[in-house]
Amino acid sequence: MKIQLIAVGTKMPAWVERGFEEYRRRFPKDMPFELVEIGAGKRGKNADIPRILQKEGEAMLAAAGRSRLVTLDIPGKPWTTEQLAVQLEAWKLDGRDVALLVGGPEGLSPECKAAAEQSWSLSPLTLPHPLVRVLVAESLYRACSITTNHPYHRE
């Protein structure tokens, strides 16, 4: 099973790239984890936000292909680390790749939300999108360490 983090936005600060890469490289070879960046639509005073969301959503769905879609969204379901580990195991048994979708400043398109099989909430707080990348990478790695009995996670 491959996991993709499909996120709107490019040109992240160096600390985001380093933080994401630190956890990405730790993933086991049989569970590759990759970042797919989607260019953000140009936003300005007179920007057509619904159209921008639609275009970003189309690009995200195209990048995901036939993967299981999981949105990262405040109204989604919060998972503990242990529950995320159970989700990882369930996703493995499903046999499909997994695409985690992170929207831009206005969130995800209605099409992405409608196509998703699951929605995961990292927090009821609004988090900066660059930080979400690092949080997701660490959370998934921690959950993976539980499933493989690696000592990274301690209770």
Curated annotation (Swiss-Prot):
Organism: Aeromonas salmonicida (strain A449)
MF terms (GO), sorted A to Z: rRNA (pseudouridine-N3-)-methyltransferase activity
Top-level enzyme category: transferase
Binding positions for S-adenosyl-L-methionine per the UniProt entry: L72, G103, L122, S123, P124, L125, T126, L127
HAMAP family xref list: 23SrRNA_methyltr_H
Name of the protein in question: Ribosomal RNA large subunit methyltransferase H
Keyword presence, Cytoplasm: yes
Signal peptide coordinates: none
PANTHER family cross-referenced by the UniProt entry: METHYLTRANSFERASE, RIBOSOMAL RNA LARGE SUBUNIT METHYLTRANSFERASE H
E.C. code: 2.1.1.177
Function comment: Specifically methylates the pseudouridine at position 1915 (m3Psi1915) in 23S rRNA.
Keywords attached to this entry: Cytoplasm, Methyltransferase, rRNA processing, S-adenosyl-L-methionine, Transferase
Entry superkingdom: Bacteria
UniProt-annotated location(s): Cytoplasm
Family annotation (Gene3D superfamilies): 3.40.1280.10
Predominant subcellular localization, coarse grouping: cytoplasm
Assembly and binders: Homodimer.
Cellular compartments per GO CC: cytoplasm
The reaction(s) this protein catalyses: pseudouridine(1915) in 23S rRNA + S-adenosyl-L-methionine = N(3)-methylpseudouridine(1915) in 23S rRNA + S-adenosyl-L-homocysteine + H(+)
